Amino acid sequence: MVKAFTLTAAVALLSAPLASAHYILNILMHNGKQVGGEYTYVRKNSNTYMPSFMEIIDSKDLRCNKGATSAGTKTYDVKAGDKVGLKLFNNEFIEHPGPGFFYLSKAPGNVSDYDGSGDWFKVWESGPTGSPTSTSGWPTYGKYTMEFTLPTTLQDGEYLLRGEHIGIHENRGSLSLYLNYMECAQIRISGGTGTANPSPVSKIPGIYSKTDPGLTFNFWGGKGAYVMPGPAVAKL
């Protein structure tokens, strides 16, 4: 009886970080440095650090998280070709295995007035570089930030920068409990050549279906290659 309890407790302790570590990408990064604080340039939402589950896949909340608002959010100036990204709050790091993404959507005018209902295109993704059933196989695992370089061909203007990380660690067998974490920063891009004609473009919601293999992949014993969810990284 004591032996069984000890084993159960040990398993629970080992799996606790994967199961309980929630986070939010609410700090803007520019050329490797943090700019502002939490929510200075990232839209605040009502979900705080909690994940969203599959019910959000068909909701407009998939754009920038539940209850996201531009009220009080500033817009940050960057140059095409700069490195930008998002940092986790409270010096947390990504403690779930899974893919990371960045999307852009150009506002028709002032990004503070834009709800993200226009076209989105994926500009960056990070999938497994090793086994998708091991945390060490995911480059985003253990990182404090996700960052990428803005294409130099972008059109000048104001954009929503959507960062997303998807935790697949709760998927077991036929049970799909993937976790979506997403936030939107407001940026103003200048200095681009303006020659970009992004393809493909997508609407959000519309980038996923609830049963996409890349969302439902069984981290605890899945077989075969991992298929990245969502559209391809856009050609610019």
Which functions belong to the PLM regions below?
Residues 159-163:
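A short tyrosine-centered beta-strand micro-motif
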Residues 2-100, 107-145, 168-236:
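Peripheral, solvent-exposed domain-edge segments
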Residues 151, 164-168:
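Histidine- and/or cysteine-centered catalytic micro-motif in compact active-site loops
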Residues 82, 157-158:
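Surface-exposed loop/turn positions
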Residues 150, 155-157:
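A glycine-anchored, Pro-Gly-centered beta-turn/N-cap motif
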